Amino acid sequence: MKILISNDDGVNAEGIAALTTALNQIAETLTVGPDRNCSGASNSLTLTNPLRLNTLDNGFISVSGTPTDCVHLAIRELYQDEPDMVVSGINAGANMGDDTLYSGTVAAAMEGRFLGFPAIAISLVGHELKHYDTAAHYALKIVKALQDSPIAQDKILNINVPDLPLAEVKGIKITRLGARHRAEGMVRTQDPAGREIFWLGPPGDEQDASDGTDFYAVANGYVSITPLTVDLTAFEQLSALESWLTQIHD
């Protein structure tokens, strides 16, 4: 089995090393990640600059691009034979609810699925992020299960693991995405030259963290698995929009 591993925290991040070590037990892995932290990169591609590669001492390959660039480049150019699966992570922090729209971790998995391969994204949720070994354990279990029973062709699995010792995790829940309140405002400050600058503020608190959501599962000590689709069409709105279309006049 061949597995392509990527992330958005950068090729030197602790999470991608833990994930690679775990998956090396069952697969031939190729680890290709951005040369810097690309958190929040979503599905962005590098279109105006060339991509430069560097092979590190541990065999990982760094790319001067986004997580999506990494997966696209690896599959198109670095593999003689295609991988069997794409695994993205282990992200340093949650990718739940609205986070998935901005996440480079989820985007790397999404690019794998766009290109026709089973794909999962895995994140470690907590404040101190001590237990990458727990997330790696569940990544290994889930990859083994996918090897035996693949999921639908147009889906990826978004996995969030509570930052707990393995023995304290209560199990796995299949969940839907929750939702956050609107993000807090920008942080206004000055650079050393006295010029005004802005930082993005923290994300909003949970708005929908009810039973059945990813937020609820992780908060209660469970691993959350949420199936995501790459087709963003709101199918339930199609017929309503057909009726609405009659209101548009020349």
UniProtKB/Swiss-Prot annotation:
Cellular component terms per the entry's GO annotation: cytoplasm
Stored InterPro entries: SurE (IPR030048), SurE-like_Pase/nucleotidase (IPR002828), SurE-like_sf (IPR036523)
Top-tier EC class: hydrolase
Reactions the enzyme catalyzes: a ribonucleoside 5'-phosphate + H2O = a ribonucleoside + phosphate
Compartmental location: Cytoplasm
One of the record's GO molecular function terms: metal ion binding
Coiled-coil parts of chain: none
Keyword presence, tRNA processing: no
Domain of life (superkingdom): Bacteria
Keyword Iron-sulfur: no
Annotated positions binding a divalent metal cation: D8, D9, S39, N91
Cofactor needs: a divalent metal cation
Cofactor note: Binds 1 divalent metal cation per subunit.
Pfam families assigned to the protein according to its UniProt record, in alphabetical order: SurE
Assigned keywords, A-Z: Cytoplasm, Hydrolase, Metal-binding, Nucleotide-binding
E.C. number(s) listed in UniProt: 3.1.3.5
Function as written in the Swiss-Prot or TrEMBL entry: Nucleotidase that shows phosphatase activity on nucleoside 5'-monophosphates.
UniProt record similarity statement: Belongs to the SurE nucleotidase family.
NCBIfam families (UniProt xref): PRK00346.1-3, PRK00346.1-4, surE
The protein's name in its UniProt record: 5'-nucleotidase SurE
Organism: Shewanella halifaxensis (strain HAW-EB4)
Top-level taxonomy: Bacteria, Pseudomonadati, Pseudomonadota, Gammaproteobacteria, Alteromonadales
